[in-house]
């Protein structure tokens, strides 16, 4: 059997305050596409969407699709979203471990507000403050 999810390598730098609030993220994400690019270039926007689940403050993400001599991967459900979400959660766990805080506390402090959600998701419908 061939296929599977695309492996990624991420090199990142994250800025944060002593209370766990993240102020900036700079990341370089390399997607291993295998010998054939196939669906891989379409993963980039989905991967970015997975990263946007937290309010990073200032965010700079550079994603590269890397053609290698390995077997190609295929598209699976939510291609890119899983990798982006995993990267985001790994960074939050790293911040929590560095500060000695509970990871859920750090995650909660970095969830979007209505205003930050409008900045990170400008082309979508973001509801008002009622019930948010």
Language-model features: locations:
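Glycine-rich loop/linker segments at domain edges
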Residues: 7-90
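N-terminal leader/propeptide and maturation segments of large enzyme subunits in energy/redox metabolism
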Residues: 75-132
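Beta-strand segments within the central parallel beta-sheet cores of soluble alpha/beta enzyme folds
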Residues: 1, 23-28, 104-112
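Flexible loop/turn segments at secondary-structure boundaries
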Residues: 1, 32-36, 113-118
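Short glycine-biased active-site loop of nucleotidyltransferases that positions the nucleotide triphosphate
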Residues: 2-6
């Amino acid at each position: 059997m061939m296929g599977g999810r695309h492996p990624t390598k991420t090199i990142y730098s994250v800025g944060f305050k002593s209370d766990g609030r993240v102020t900036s993220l700079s990341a370089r994400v390399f997607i291993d596409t295998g010998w054939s690019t196939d669906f891989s270039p379409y993963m980039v926007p989905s991967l970015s969407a997975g990263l946007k689940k937290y309010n990073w403050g200032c965010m700079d993400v550079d994603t590269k699709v890397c053609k290698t001599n390995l077997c190609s991967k295929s598209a699976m459900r939510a291609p890119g979203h899983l990798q982006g979400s995993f990267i985001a959660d790994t960074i939050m766990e790293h911040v929590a471990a560095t500060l000695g805080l509970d990871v859920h506390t750090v995650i909660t402090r970095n969830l979007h507000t209505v205003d930050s959600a409008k900045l990170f998701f400008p082309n979508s419908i973001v509801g008002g403050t009622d019930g948010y």
